[in-house]
Amino acid sequence: MTNIRKSHPLMKIINNAFIDLPAPSNISSWWNFGSLLGICLILQILTGLFLAMHYTSDTTTAFSSVTHICRDVNYGWIIRYLHANGASMFFICLFIHVGRGMYYGSYMFRETWNIGVILLFTVMATAFMGYVLPWGQMSFWGATVITNLLSAIPYIGTNLVEWIWGGFSVDKATLTRFFAFHFILPFIITALATVHLLFLHETGSNNPTGISSDMDKIPFHPYYTIKDILGALFMMLILLILVLFSPDLLGDPDNYTPANPLSTPTHIKPEWYFLFAYAILRSIPNKLGGVLALVASILILILMRMLHTSKQRSMMFRPLSQCLFWMLVADLIALTWIGGQAVEHPFIIIGQLASILNFLIILVLMPMPSIIENNLLKW
C-alpha cells in the first residue's frame, strides 16, 4: 500500500514541498531565513487576530483600546509586544534573506526573485499601516508625512492623497481603511509566499557555490527540518528576550502620547526598519526626487539580474565583489543611523553621501570587479 503522504492529493503537495523535496546537501544557515519568515508570518497573523478582537479603529477610542489590551485583557500585553517586536524580527529575517540572495546570486531565479521583491513591498506597506493603528503621536504624524509624499505625483497627486485619506486630513476614515488593509494584507502575503515557494521548487534551491547541485541532493526531511527548528528556537529566544526584558527598545516614546493634530513632534521618524529608506528620501531636497529615490532604493533589486556580469553565480569565490557587498551592508547600516537623526549638519551631508554610495555600489561598482574577476579566471 502506498504511503498516504504520497497518494493523498493534499498531503502529496505538502510532501513534495517540505518532506521529500530534493535539497542541496551543502546549504548553510543563511538558507534558514525563508522558514523563519514563514514562522514570523504565522506569529504575526495569530497575534494580530487576537489584537483585532479587542482593538477599535476609531480615532476617539483607538489609543484607549490599545491601552485596554495591555492592562485589562488576559496576557494582552504579551500579545501586543509579540506583535510589535515580531514585526522587527520579520524585517531582520527579511533583510538577511534578501542579502543572502544578493550574495549567493539567487536573483538568477527570475520569477522567484521578482515575487520576492513584490513581497518586500507588500510587507513594508503592511508594517507601515500597522504602525498607524495605535494612534499615538508618531502614528498620526508618520501617516501624515508618508501619505503626503504621494502629492508629489504630477497632476493626480493631491486628489490621490485626499482619496487615500478619505477627507482633507488623516482622520477617522484613514484609520478605518488602514485597519482594513492591515488585516487583509497578511493573507495576500501568505498567498504570494506560496507562489514564491512554487517558483522556487520549479528550479530547486541555490547553494553557496552557485553551481548546480542536481547530482548531490538529499531529502528535506529530516536534515533541513531539524536545522530549521534549531533556527526557529534561536529566533524565538531572541524575540522572547526582547519582549520580556525590553519590549519598548525598538519603539518610539512619542507613540505613548495620544495623537494630536495640533502638536507636531520634534523629530518625525518611522520604525527602525524603514530608516534607511527614510534617510534616502530626506537626502534629496526635491519632493518628487525624494519619492523616486525612495521607491528606487527597493525597486533596484529587480535590476540585480541584469547587473550580473560575472561568469560565476555566487560571490563565494569572488573576493572583490565580497568587499563591495559588505560595503553596501555598512552603507545601509549608516543610512539607518542617519534616518533616526535630526535634519541638521553634519547628518544631512552624511545622508546624501551614503545615499549616493548606495546606488553607486549597486549600479556601477558591483558590476565592475566582476569583469576583472572574469579576466583573472583566464590566468
Curated annotation (Swiss-Prot):
Residues holding heme b b562: H83, H182
Keywords for this protein: Electron transport, Heme, Iron, Membrane, Metal-binding, Mitochondrion, Mitochondrion inner membrane, Respiratory chain, Transmembrane, Transmembrane helix, Transport, Ubiquinone
Gene Ontology, cellular component aspect: mitochondrial inner membrane; respiratory chain complex III
Chief location category: mitochondrion
Residue sites binding heme b b566 per the record: H97, H196
Essential cofactor(s): heme b
Residue stretches spanning the membrane: 33-53, 77-98, 113-133, 178-198, 226-246, 288-308, 320-340, 347-367
Binding site for a ubiquinone: H201
Superkingdom to which the source organism belongs: Eukaryota
PROSITE patterns assigned to the protein according to its UniProt record, in alphabetical order: CYTB_CTER, CYTB_NTER
GO BP terms, alphabetized: mitochondrial electron transport, ubiquinol to cytochrome c
Cofactor note: Binds 2 heme b groups non-covalently.
Topology in membrane: Multi-pass membrane protein
Location of the protein in the cell: Mitochondrion inner membrane
Assembly and interaction partners: The cytochrome bc1 complex contains 11 subunits: 3 respiratory subunits (MT-CYB, CYC1 and UQCRFS1), 2 core proteins (UQCRC1 and UQCRC2) and 6 low-molecular weight proteins (UQCRH/QCR6, UQCRB/QCR7, UQCRQ/QCR8, UQCR10/QCR9, UQCR11/QCR10 and a cleavage product of UQCRFS1). This cytochrome bc1 complex then forms a dimer.
Role, per record: Component of the ubiquinol-cytochrome c reductase complex (complex III or cytochrome b-c1 complex) that is part of the mitochondrial respiratory chain. The b-c1 complex mediates electron transfer from ubiquinol to cytochrome c. Contributes to the generation of a proton gradient across the mitochondrial membrane that is then used for ATP synthesis.
Miscellaneous note of the record: Heme 1 (or BL or b562) is low-potential and absorbs at about 562 nm, and heme 2 (or BH or b566) is high-potential and absorbs at about 566 nm.
Family as reported in the entry's similarity comment: Belongs to the cytochrome b family.
UniProt-recorded name of the protein: Cytochrome b
Organism this protein belongs to: Sus cebifrons
